[in-house]
Amino acid sequence: MGQVKQAIIEVEDFVCGCLREGRTLNQTIRDARESLAAKTNPYFDDEDLVENKYYQFKGAE
């Protein structure tokens, strides 16, 4: 279970970084899929998770 939590935290950190750079949702999803982390973390390919995290952080701003 710890590995799953760590994998999700990596996605959260990635999405947060994209928001700081002013990336759009579509850019963030594309970047997540193309990132090196996607090779070892299947959650980077989960569009729904990336979208949920994007709006979760966007709403917190």
Where are these regions (language model features)?
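Short, charge-rich amphipathic interface segments used for partner binding and complex assembly
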Residues: 25-60
